[in-house]
């Protein structure tokens, strides 16, 4: 049991709105759970279904087996692709090995994949703005065989060398800092005036909304706690947004990670959560902050999200068939 020393005496807790799960994460988790209900364990999941330790451990306890590469799954097994998406090479490998696939790629990531295919088919080279090594970036870069470049900073743009400067397009990772992505996109357009931009921003609605909510939250607080795992891109961006507003901010996996010293003398403590962090963790953090002396909790005004994505047709069809037999 955690100690209840008082370090945040009489502080107010402010909750960002919106926060936590997005439609793509809800859908991805639902796909794994439904696959387990239909087929039983084990269900193999390539990479973490979403970047949250609590979610991954919960699904592991239900029978999901998380693997790094497809050759770790037996031939013919059921495999779920994570919400971050996969390359064409991974899809080809799954087909060659006879794996039965449920694709949990976020539809907003799939939108970027379609843009890449369309632009490459038109003969354009593509610059992707994103973080090297992130699964989403690897999946998007793997939608084409060559003709793609990755940049992360304005400095990367200055150093970029492309084959055909007059025939370029760009796309972005969906979970970037809105402000950082805008700066890099601006640098691309300044250096390559004819570069084709996405018809609609590739940064997803949930990333945008959660960053906007923190921009409203941070000026009201002297500390912001962001609930999310360290490998979550969008959660890290929320911490950065708060820090850029001049507020101390920490990224935490849950209530157990709170250092009471952080709360010493704080009068207003903001709490938000990345798009892959469940609300149960937020409420545990609120309870812990109350134990440490906070006396009130208030939710900031903000957007009420109503976005929902359907399950893959193959999975929803099997669910319907099963339910019709009951």
Curated annotation (Swiss-Prot):
This is 4-hydroxy-3-methylbut-2-enyl diphosphate reductase. It comes from the Bacteria. It catalyses: isopentenyl diphosphate + 2 oxidized [2Fe-2S]-[ferredoxin] + H2O = (2E)-4-hydroxy-3-methylbut-2-enyl diphosphate + 2 reduced [2Fe-2S]-[ferredoxin] + 2 H(+); dimethylallyl diphosphate + 2 oxidized [2Fe-2S]-[ferredoxin] + H2O = (2E)-4-hydroxy-3-methylbut-2-enyl diphosphate + 2 reduced [2Fe-2S]-[ferredoxin] + 2 H(+). CDD domains: lytB_ispH. Dimethylallyl diphosphate binds at residues 51, 84, 134, 232-234, 276. Binds 1 [4Fe-4S] cluster per subunit. [4Fe-4S] cluster binds at residues 22, 106, 204. Belongs to the IspH family. GO terms for molecular function: 4 iron, 4 sulfur cluster binding; 4-hydroxy-3-methylbut-2-enyl diphosphate reductase activity; metal ion binding. Its EC number is 1.17.7.4. The lineage of its organism: Bacteria, Pseudomonadati, Pseudomonadota, Betaproteobacteria, Burkholderiales. Keywords: 4Fe-4S, Iron, Iron-sulfur, Isoprene biosynthesis, Metal-binding, Oxidoreductase. Catalyzes the conversion of 1-hydroxy-2-methyl-2-(E)-butenyl 4-diphosphate (HMBPP) into a mixture of isopentenyl diphosphate (IPP) and dimethylallyl diphosphate (DMAPP). Acts in the terminal step of the DOXP/MEP pathway for isoprenoid precursor biosynthesis. It comes from Bordetella bronchiseptica (strain ATCC BAA-588 / NCTC 13252 / RB50). It holds the Pfam family LYTB. One of its GO terms (biological process) is dimethylallyl diphosphate biosynthetic process. Pathway: Isoprenoid biosynthesis; dimethylallyl diphosphate biosynthesis; dimethylallyl diphosphate from (2E)-4-hydroxy-3-methylbutenyl diphosphate: step 1/1; Isoprenoid biosynthesis; isopentenyl diphosphate biosynthesis via DXP pathway; isopentenyl diphosphate from 1-deoxy-D-xylulose 5-phosphate: step 6/6. Signal peptide: none annotated. Its cofactor is [4Fe-4S] cluster. The active site is at 136 (proton donor). Isopentenyl diphosphate binds at residues 51, 84, 134, 232-234, 276. (2E)-4-hydroxy-3-methylbut-2-enyl diphosphate binds at residues 51, 84, 134, 174, 232-234, 276. It is an enzyme of class 1 (oxidoreductase).
């Amino acid at each position: 049991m955690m100690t209840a020393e008082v370090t945040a005496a009489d502080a107010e807790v402010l909750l960002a709105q919106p926060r936590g799960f997005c439609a793509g994460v809800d859908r991805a988790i639902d796909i794994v759970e439904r696959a387990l209900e239909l087929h039983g364990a084990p269900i193999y999941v390539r990479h973490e279904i979403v970047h949250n330790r609590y979610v991954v451990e919960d699904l592991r306890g239900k029978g999901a087996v998380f693997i790094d590469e497809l050759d770790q799954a037996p031939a013919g097994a059921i495999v779920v692709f994570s919400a971050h998406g996969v390359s064409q090479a991974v899809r080809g490998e799954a087909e060659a090995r006879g794996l039965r696939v449920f694709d949990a790629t976020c539809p907003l990531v799939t939108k970027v994949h379609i843009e890449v295919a369309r632009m490459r088919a038109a003969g354009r080279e593509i610059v992707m703005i994103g973080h090297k090594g992130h699964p989403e970036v690897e999946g998007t870069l793997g939608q084409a065989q060559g003709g793609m470049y990755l940049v992360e900073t304005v400095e990367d743009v200055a150093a970029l060398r492309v084959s055909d400067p007059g025939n370029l397009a760009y796309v972005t990772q969906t979970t970037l800092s809105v402000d950082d992505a805008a700066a890099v996109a601006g640098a691309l357009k300044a250096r390559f005036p004819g570069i084709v931009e996405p018809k609609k921003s590739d940064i997803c609605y949930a990333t945008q909304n959660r960053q906007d909510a923190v921009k409203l939250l941070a000026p009201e607080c002297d500390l912001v706690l962001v609930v999310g795992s360290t490998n979550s891109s969008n959660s890290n961006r929320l911490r950065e947004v708060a820090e850029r507003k001049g507020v101390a901010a920490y990224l935490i996996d849950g209530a157990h990670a709170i250092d009471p010293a952080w709360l010493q003398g704080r009068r207003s403590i903001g709490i938000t959560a990345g798009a892959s962090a469940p609300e149960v963790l937020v409420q545990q953090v609120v309870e812990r902050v109350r134990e440490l002396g906070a006396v009130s909790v208030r939710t900031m005004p903000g957007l009420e999200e109503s976005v929902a994505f359907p399950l893959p047709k193959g999975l929803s069809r099997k669910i319907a068939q099963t339910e019709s037999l009951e």
